[in-house]
């Protein structure tokens, strides 16, 4: 295993999950091209995502195990829950997109037909025989149409981040495609994300306006911030605190601070509970790195054994399942394997 293999951004992971526990607010993430699909992170989404997005209290029926033969990126994980409203219909919630993005994390391993079959099975595992089942299938077909339309854009929609006009055009194109393909699902799927992207673009335009003095820029940025909804403003403030925590932890690690010194410093700025969570995350991370190193060594032995691709992949998948037993760990290991293979 290389020095970098198996290491997701450690400082960021510790800060996000340990110190603050809130996912960072996306910046102008739209500009990276086609929509990204969250594999291991989406696999760990909790069942209360529907409540977070305002779905009614009616619980979905208990999920039944999906069919065997899950693709390797999803091995050892389970799909996020599909939320229902009080009448038993599929709730118009971001959680539905999270479910589809979970399935899409296996896209590189599956043909289009196999991916459709996977989604059909996963929907049936939760909604078989309910009125929400055909509704979920319809939304899936709409979402696929959205992604297919994005893929047909020049360079899959990627643009030069320094070209504000191109950024504006890209955002407008995506909004139009989402509305055309998703209809009234475009708002729950992308509404909050699009608002943040428009807000960030407006900030960039002010910051890069050479006709404004620094004082005028500050005034306009402050006025723009006042237009932000209260919940969004609170989320931004938490994200700012999170980034400050990330920066502080990175600086402490860079300076070679001992675990006790780091915990004492973080206790002053983040409080004892958050500092304790950071310490626990560091211990968990060290344990993960050690286990992944052992796994990678055994994986290398399997790869060097001259097996057929099918037997090799089966043995590596079985090894992952033996060594990574906690929810999401096998998915994370598989993701790191793919990244290491791409780098070789």
UniProtKB/Swiss-Prot annotation:
The keyword Chaperone applies. Pfam families: Lipase_chap (PF03280). Residues 45-57 have a biased composition (Low complexity). It is found in: Cell inner membrane. GO terms for molecular function: unfolded protein binding. Residues 45-78 are annotated as: Disordered. It comes from the Bacteria. GO terms for biological process: lipid catabolic process; protein folding. The chain crosses the membrane at residues 14-34. GO terms for cellular component: plasma membrane. InterPro entries: Lipase_chaperone. Keywords: Cell inner membrane, Cell membrane, Chaperone, Lipid degradation, Lipid metabolism, Membrane, Transmembrane, Transmembrane helix. The keyword Transmembrane helix applies. May be involved in the folding of the extracellular lipase during its passage through the periplasm. Belongs to the lipase chaperone family. This is Lipase chaperone. The lineage of its organism: Bacteria, Pseudomonadati, Pseudomonadota, Betaproteobacteria, Burkholderiales. The gene is lifO.
């Amino acid at each position: 295993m290389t020095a970098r293999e198996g290491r997701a951004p450690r400082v960021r992971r510790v800060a996000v999950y340990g110190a603050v526990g809130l996912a960072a607010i996306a910046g102008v993430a739209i500009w990276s091209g086609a929509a990204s699909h969250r594999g291991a992170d989406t696999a760990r989404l909790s069942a209360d995502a529907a409540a977070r997005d305002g779905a009614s209290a009616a619980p979905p029926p208990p999920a039944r195990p999906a069919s065997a033969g899950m693709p390797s990126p999803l091995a050892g994980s389970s799909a996020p829950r599909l939320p229902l409203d009080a009448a038993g219909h599929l709730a118009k919630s971001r959680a539905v997109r999270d479910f589809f993005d979970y399935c899409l994390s296996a896209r590189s391993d599956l043909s289009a037909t196999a991916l459709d079959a996977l989604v059909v099975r996963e929907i049936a595992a939760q909604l078989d025989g309910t009125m929400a089942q055909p509704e979920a299938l319809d939304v899936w077909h709409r979402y696929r149409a959205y992604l297919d339309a994005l893929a047909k854009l020049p360079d899959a929609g990627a643009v030069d981040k320094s070209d504000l006009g191109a950024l504006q055009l890209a955002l407008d194109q995506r909004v139009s495609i989402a509305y055309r393909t998703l209809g009234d699902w475009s708002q729950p799927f992308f509404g909050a994300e699009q608002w943040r992207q428009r807000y960030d673009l407006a900030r960039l335009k002010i910051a890069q306006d050479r006709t404004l003095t620094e004082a005028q820029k500050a005034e306009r940025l402050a006025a723009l911030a006042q237009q932000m909804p209260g919940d969004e403003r609170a989320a931004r403030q938490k994200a700012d605190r999170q980034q400050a925590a990330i920066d502080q932890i990175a600086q402490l690690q860079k300076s070679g601070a001992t675990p006790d010194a780091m915990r004492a410093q973080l206790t002053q700025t983040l409080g004892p509970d958050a500092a304790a969570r950071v310490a626990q995350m560091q211990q968990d991370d060290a344990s993960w790195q050690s286990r992944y190193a052992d796994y990678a060594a055994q994986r290398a032995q399997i790869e060097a054994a001259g097996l057929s691709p099918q037997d090799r992949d089966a043995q590596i998948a079985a090894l992952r399942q033996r060594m990574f037993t906690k929810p999401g760990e096998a998915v994370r290991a598989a993701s790191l394997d793919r990244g290491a293979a791409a780098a070789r």
